[in-house]
A protein has these predicted regions:
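Long lumenal/extracellular ectodomains of secretory and single-pass membrane proteins
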Residues: 2-383, 398-527
């Protein structure tokens, strides 16, 4: 009798975050699973704003664990590690972690004498995507390893400098508040101008003059933006507000590369309606999102507000900005004016484009325990992991054909919602539910659904019935979305219909769609 070689037989799809089989305890005493080194590093990297404390780990402990894991894999698996770092800075949008990771990658490989795999120079260049980041990497290196900067680091930075330095970037990022000015970096790495950018040699010389002879430095004629900026700076203070209010004022500010951050200082006065309306056309999308409340307080016109709303809700702008979904919730809470609610809802939806529309019946569980509320996601955010979990869980439930949305902690409860309802409105229904009894939540709400998705930090409390994934029949997929990157998971993963993903963006949700279609999940940079 044929038992395996049948048309109905299908290999169980696998995923990349893999447990080792070793039993460890979660921070709350639950029976957890150790993950292999690559899996532990990936989950930590995609959820780790460097030096940010969490409920169970100090910022220093997390940073040390990240560096230790990365140094190990830089030597033993350099291709995988280089792929992670490039993806982390790009689609993963974890800027500081990628920069720190690149420095640790190079240091570990130089110390070990390793030469196989992607070059140190290539990895350094791959994580530097913004003009201020060469200085960030240099500052981290010298603070951690001293002022002797090895050649691969210098060459990688030089490659990035040729790609990133131009007139506007110099105005925005080459400021007196920086420890490493553009001129310092050019002196240190000896970057040659890009031969395809004939103006860059003059720009480099000007950056050096600005650093060493600021009173006599003259902007090059090959850079109209630097010349226009110098003209504005030379205007007497009493004449500056007229530039803002006169016809063509917005265009003149944009041509001079004057950012909204610099405008108030240049005016030496308040950012009133006229000032905001002049600078709004040249502001980036996320700068607009962060300043919605300021626009309301200044009384910007409905016409200007409509142009802001159109840009915020534009899918191409959202994709270009590469912002985390929780940024739009933060803006919604900070500026609850009705005129911003709809474009922010649109933007949030576009930022969750990879969240799948799952068929059949789905149980979605959102962790609202105390540890999820403990610390902010980043220095610039007032939101926490509980907020991020609610965003992802709600989006999953709304897009699924038939979903039960449950919040859990010490207790659990089902949340009601209507098809097509606003994600931002549903988020107001979530609460703070204390401890982390994930097992009981699943036992209370699993009623034969086709799959279970849990958005959590995985630090569940001991339960005599076992780990959360054991409460679901073995043939039913259980997907865990990890938002914290702690070492121990709440169940097995990688095979047998048990899968773990992670991060604060929607990027890895693509893997859910792969597995649902019977294909193996892959690391995001290999998908």
């Amino acid at each position: 009798m044929a038992r395996f070689n049948t048309k109905a037989a299908r290999a169980q799809p696998t995923s990349r975050v893999t447990s080792t089989g070793r039993i460890l305890r979660t921070y709350e005493g639950g029976r957890g699973r150790e993950r292999d080194t690559r899996s532990e590093l990936f989950l930590l990297a995609v959820a780790n704003f460097v030096s940010q404390q969490t409920f169970y780990e100090s910022g220093t402990d997390r940073d040390d664990r990240f560096a230790k894991l990365l140094r190990e894999l830089a030597v033993t698996d350099p291709a995988w590690t280089a792929g992670l770092l490039g993806w982390l800075r790009g689609e993963g949008n974890m800027r500081t972690a990628a920069i720190v990771g690149a420095a640790e990658y190079v240091h570990a490989r130089l110390t070990a004498g390793a030469t196989d795999g992607p070059s140190n120079r290539q990895v350094v260049a791959s994580v530097l995507q913004r003009p201020d980041e060469p200085g960030e990497l240099l500052a981290y290196w010298t603070a951690t390893y001293g002022r002797a900067v090895p050649k691969p680091v210098k060459r990688g930075i030089a490659d990035a400098v040729r790609r990133l330095y131009h007139g506007k970037s110099l105005l925005k990022y080459d400021t007196a508040s920086k420890g490493y000015r553009f001129g310092d970096i050019l002196n240190l790495v000896h970057a040659a101008p890009d031969p395809d950018k004939p103006w860059q040699g003059e720009l480099f010389r000007y950056a050096l003059d600005r650093r060493h002879n600021p009173d006599t430095a003259v902007p090059p004629t090959s850079s109209p933006v630097l010349g226009a900026h110098r003209e504005l700076m030379a205007l007497p203070v009493g004449q500056r507000r007229a530039v803002v209010t006169e016809p063509g004022g917005a265009e003149r500010l944009a041509a001079a590369g004057l950012t909204w951050e610099a405008l108030a200082g240049w005016l030496q006065g308040p950012m009133d309606k006229a000032a905001w309306e002049a600078v709004i056309p040249s502001m980036g999308t996320m700068a607009l999102v962060r300043n919605l409340r300021n626009f309301d307080e200044a009384g910007v016109s409905d016409e200007i507000a409509a142009s802001v709303a159109a840009r915020i809700g534009d899918p191409a702008e959202v994709a270009r900005s590469r912002q985390f979904p929780f940024r739009y919730l933060a803006a919604y809470r900070h500026a609850p004016s009705l005129r911003w609610a709809y474009p922010l809802e649109q933007a949030l939806g576009h930022s969750l484009a990879n969240v799948p529309a799952l068929p059949g019946r789905t149980l979605v569980l959102v962790d609202r325990s105390g540890s999820m509320f403990y610390s902010r996601l980043s220095e610039r955010s007032e939101l926490n992991r509980a907020d991020a979990a609610a965003i992802f869980g709600t989006a999953l439930a709304l897009r699924a054909a038939d979903a039960d949305l449950v919040e859990f902690g010490t207790t659990s409860r089902r949340l009601t919602f209507g098809k097509g309802e606003s994600v931002l409105k549903i988020l107001d229904r979530f609460g703070d539910l204390g401890g982390t009894d994930t097992t009981s939540a699943i036992r209370s709400h699993y009623r034969g659904q086709d799959r279970v998705l849990i958005v959590t930090d995985e630090q569940y409390a001991f339960n005599r019935h076992g780990d959360p994934t054991q409460q679901v029949p073995a043939h039913i997929p259980v997907y865990t979305w990890n938002l914290a990157g702690y070492r121990v998971g709440h169940g097995p993963s990688g095979t047998g219909h048990r899968h773990v993903f992670g991060g604060l963006s929607d990027a890895a949700f693509r893997t859910v769609s792969l597995i649902e279609s019977g294909r193996d999940g892959r690391w995001p940079w290999l998908a």
